[in-house]
Amino acid sequence: MTVLLFTLIVLVGAFLAGLLGSLTGLGGGVIIIPLLNLGLGVDIHYAIGASIISVIATSSGSAAAYVKEGITNVRIGMFLEIATTASAIVGVIIATYIKADYIVVIFGLILLFSAVMMLRKKVDHSNNEQTSVLANYFKLNGSYPTEDGVKQYAVHRVLGGFAMMFVAGTLSGLLGIGSGALKVIGMDNIMRIPFKVSTTTSNFMIGVTAAASALVYLHKGQIDPMIAMPVTIGVITGATLGAKILIKTKTDKLKVVFAIVVTFLALQMIYNGLSGKA
């Protein structure tokens, strides 16, 4: 395969990954890494390195818009980033010492989990209940704009959410994905933050977490510009288009189809990892 053909395939694949990732809320990494590893035979470490760069780029663009709209809770994001940034570096170090086959299997399992999370019914936790002591101490409670005016919300179980962020950060560094599903669980289910706030705050955090991982991958020489550049351009373009389509389109059926595709990719990666074909 020529360099030009490889670049074109990666560019088109990354565009579709960014488009579908934006429409379904999973991000492009869950598609682009299997494409590079399974489809094009790229070493899993280099596939992860390219994905991390694209995660930084896409998160930075959309995060700025959400912060400007006043939906993102920047204070919660920066507080939880203490856990995710430190653990992301731990994840990258772990990736150095375990076989690529194991990384592929873990990635497949996370894909399965993400597919289930994508179909999960969303619950809004907007509330004015009594908050936790730590939330008051760190001033994490907040508000966000809605069609019915500004809604106040209280933050709960701060330590539980912080612990979940450590797990999410480790997986982000290990696998090169945003681990948005785990971050949303930490903020939505554990800390009981409204879903819209948890998703936008997660998006804000993903770029910072990925940046910490990228520094280590760059130091190890596992970020190849020939792969990372078309991946980043494709994912950003696809994600931008997906965001515009999302406003006008119902994505329930698309999410079901995408969950099936992701499940297939997950099983394929798990099989390859267990059989030593990764």
Where are each of the predicted segments found?
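Membrane-embedded alpha-helical segments of transport systems
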Residues: I53-G61, A83-S87, I94, M205-A212
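Transmembrane alpha-helix interface/packing and boundary motifs in multi-pass membrane proteins
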Residues: A14-G25, S62, M165-L175
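Juxtamembrane transmembrane-helix boundary motif
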Residues: M1-A17, L38, I44, K68-G169, ...
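Alpha-helical transmembrane segments of multi-pass membrane proteins
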Residues: I9-A14, A47-I53, S198, F204
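Generic transmembrane alpha-helix signature in multi-pass membrane proteins
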Residues: S60-I71, L171-S172, K183-D188, V208-I223
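Juxtamembrane transmembrane-helix termini in multi-pass membrane transport proteins
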Residues: T24-I82
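Interfacial segments of multi-pass membrane proteins
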Residues: I32-Y46, S172-G173, L182-V197
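Short hydrophobic/aromatic, small-residue-rich stretches within specific transmembrane helices
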Residues: S51-V55, S202-I206, I227-T232
